[in-house]
Amino acid sequence: MKFPNLALLILLTTTFGQSLSSKGQFWASGLTGNDVPTGQSAFESSLGYIPTLSLSRDLSDFSFIDFEWAVRFDRLYSGDSLLSNHEKNHRLWARYTSEKFEARLGLQKIVFGPSQILRSLSWFDTIDLKDPTNQTKGVDALRLKWFPNNSLSLWSWAIQNEQDTLSFGGRAEISSSIGEFGFTVHSDPSTIPKQRFALDFRHDGYIGSWLETALITSENSDIKLTTIGADYTLPILN
């Protein structure tokens, strides 16, 4: 563990000390085959672990601040030989929450949209349905949320990308008697500027249904994406 992270942990534990919790996620997988390059083992395995530390402190009956720090460890083996070893921050954010407002700053997950596969709104995440950990890379961002009433929530964000430029966006989520609507925009002024616009909808009825549609436009091209899906829960053992 690097010294700055240890110093940060001590400082936050002292500041937030009202509530401290920890958890972790571990996974392992193996792969074997008969078409193996010379000198390589027929068996490959991977191990991963994400320990997470959470701290929180109440400010009033309706507001609190909290902090989360998670580190991801990944190892890949060929037989008993170590092929790769990665260690990096997975989440590192601080948040203020009140009855109608939330602000979160740091390395965090930003995910939205109703679809689970073929996701047109997978703009800032790497969630893969084939990955049993259901984990995604984080983004360095400031995200704000407002909740004017029970049927409306408004998001805004500023994200720092790998080129150290800031991109900006926002989202509105509306609940109605016929379903849940989402409207999203994002502007990325990087080397090749892009504008993104999206509409999504989910209806939870006898048969659930959802829609995601997005337009990504730049000087060179326009990309249109649409995902439509439905689901039905069988009344077994209910």
Functional labels for PLM-detected ranges:
Residues 2-9:
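Sec-dependent signal peptide recognition
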Residues 9-17:
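Hydrophobic h-region of N-terminal signal peptides that target proteins for export
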Residues 19-33:
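Short N-terminal segments immediately surrounding and downstream of signal-peptide cleavage
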Residues 19-21, 60-65, 99-100, 129-238:
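Signature for the C-terminal beta-barrel architecture of outer-membrane proteins
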Residues 29-49:
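Surface-exposed strand-loop-strand hairpins of Gram-negative outer-membrane beta-barrel proteins
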Residues 33-37, 76-80, 112-117, 165, ...:
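Outer-membrane beta-barrel proteins
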Residues 36-41, 78-80, 127-130, 187, ...:
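Extracellular loop and loop/strand-boundary signature of outer-membrane beta-barrel proteins
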Residues 56-153, 175:
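Outer membrane beta-barrel
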